[in-house]
Amino acid sequence: MKFKNILVILNPENEKQYALARAVRLVNEQNSDAPVKITTFMTVYDLSYEMSTLLSPEERHLMHQGVITQRQKMIQPYFEKYKSPNIEFNSIVVWSNNEAEAAVSEIAKVNYDIVVKYTQQESISSLIFTPMDWQLLRKCPIPIMLIRDGDWRHQRRILIAVNVADNDDNHILINKKLVSLGLDLADILERGNIHLVTAYPPAPINMAIDLPEFNSTDCSNSIRNQYLLNMKELRQKFGIDEAHTHVKEGFPEDVIPEVAKEIEAEIVVLGTIGRTGLSAALLGNTAEQVINKLNCSLLAIKPNCS
């Protein structure tokens, strides 16, 4: 898979526009046969324009258009900076007080391949995921890349969080899509390399109290061995080296960020579902805890993404 149509959500407060820079690098590295379309998206809104009773609807509309035109002119220098025969630039600026809803509406109208958005880094160890980020993660029907800067690291390690707890058809399908997308990204980045991670649950300690004959060590080893077998089956399907698979005891919200930090991952790939957060190994609040602990970029994909 190569990206042919990319939507970049701009941040007016980010002067360097890291999301646009990352999208441009992505296009330049994938060596497409035809120009790739990069569309920038931005919302503008000023409540004072809505509250004025002195303006007619037509006058208010003209003022909106004036602000929109001004913002579009501000974007042009970036297009000049990244001008390339490989890229066809387009800009969309809409008047809206709900950036996420406006973005999802735009995505629904056009056949975009991926959304790229910058997410502010709060400190060395964590990122700030804004309310808009969370809305997009829940509602965006296509893969979304939330990045922390404008360039790719030298190692370009891609960590994919998978669920190998069982042979559930949904888990198998999601794992396949996650790994396939990760491999596509690694192929585009040339030096990109794939790692897989899964977390298996600790043995239930309380069971030893009710059942004296229960051996928690044997139980833990049994769970681990099953996860190792399932992970082996998954990695062999895609030709991934055993040294690049990580099967660790613990909870996903702890294991995934720990492994990402340990291998210095460039990006973590997760499966998402709309109403309950992230799935595969991840459900509900667990997903939010994983994301809040990440110190790298994130690529999220829904199971129904083609």
Task: Annotate the PLM regions.
Residues E59-K73, N215-Q226:
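A short acidic, glycine-rich active-site loop
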Residues K117-Q135, I267-N292:
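Glycine-rich, Arg-bearing micro-motifs that act as flexible, cationic patches
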Residues T39-F41, N90-V94, M145, H195-V197, ...:
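General small-molecule cofactor/ligand-binding pocket signal
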Residues M1-K2, E80-V115, Q236-V268, T276, ...:
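Structural beta-alpha unit
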Residues M42, T119, T198, G271-I273, ...:
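Short secondary-structure boundary segments
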Residues V116-T119, P143-D149, L299-K302:
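Short beta-strand elements of ligand-binding domains
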Residues M1-E59, R157-E213, K237:
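Small/aliphatic-rich secondary-structure junction motif
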Residues P131-W152:
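Short, structured interface segments
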